[in-house]
Amino acid sequence: MLRTMLKSKIHRATVTCADLHYVGSVTIDADLMDAADLLEGEQVTIVDIDNGARLVTYAITGERGSGVIGINGAAAHLVHPGDLVILIAYATMDDARARTYQPRIVFVDAYNKPIDMGHDPAFVPENAGELLDPRLGVG
């Protein structure tokens, strides 16, 4: 039996730009792609925390260190700059691997810089209060 499991999650990233006229995808800072073990072209689900929108697209590599989370193409109708999003990737694996697999969970600050990384999808960092809306700390 094969199971589809959580592979990677970038938690509560801030959308930095949206380009309706781009061909599609989500642009993700190369540092975040590395931290979350995402490859260019990999399928990702975007969950918009602000409005509840959910969509599936693919990742493209953004400038390293830029903090970019760019929503491209038709998805720009659903997700807007400043929105908080969760980026999720799944992997299909056999039952034995699924029982031992540890996903990559990346928490980011208001500038989309990794501040906590782990493997437990239920883990909440000590500074979770600040992560509830990292935009409050910007400025």
UniProtKB/Swiss-Prot annotation:
Subcutaneous immunization with the double panD and panC bacterial disruption mutant protects mice for over a year against subsequent virulent M.tuberculosis (strain Erdman) infections; mice show mild lung inflammation and fibrosis despite a chronic bacterila infection. This is a promising attenuated vaccine strain. GO terms for molecular function: aspartate 1-decarboxylase activity. Pfam families: Asp_decarbox (PF02261). Pathway: Cofactor biosynthesis; (R)-pantothenate biosynthesis; beta-alanine from L-aspartate: step 1/1. Is synthesized initially as an inactive proenzyme, which is activated by self-cleavage at a specific serine bond to produce a beta-subunit with a hydroxyl group at its C-terminus and an alpha-subunit with a pyruvoyl group at its N-terminus. Cleavage is not necessary for tetramerization upon expression in E.coli; protein expressed in E.coli is fully process in vitro after 48 hours at 37 degrees Celsius. Disruption phenotype: Simultaneous disruption of panD and panC gives a mutant unable to grow in the absence of panothenate. The double mutant has a highly attenuated disease response in BALB/c and SCID mice; immunocompromised BALB/c SCID mice survive on average 36 weeks as opposed to 5 weeks for mice infected with wild-type bacteria, while immunocompetent BALB/c mice survive indefinitely. In wild-type mice bacteria grow for 3 weeks then undergo a steady decline, bacteria persist over 8 months in SCID mice. Changing A128S: In S6; may confer PZA resistance. Keywords: Autocatalytic cleavage, Cytoplasm, Decarboxylase, Lyase, Pantothenate biosynthesis, Pyruvate, Schiff base, Virulence, Zymogen. It is found in: Cytoplasm. Binds 1 pyruvoyl group covalently per subunit. This is Aspartate 1-decarboxylase. It comes from Mycobacterium tuberculosis (strain ATCC 25618 / H37Rv). The lineage of its organism: Bacteria, Bacillati, Actinomycetota, Actinomycetes, Mycobacteriales.
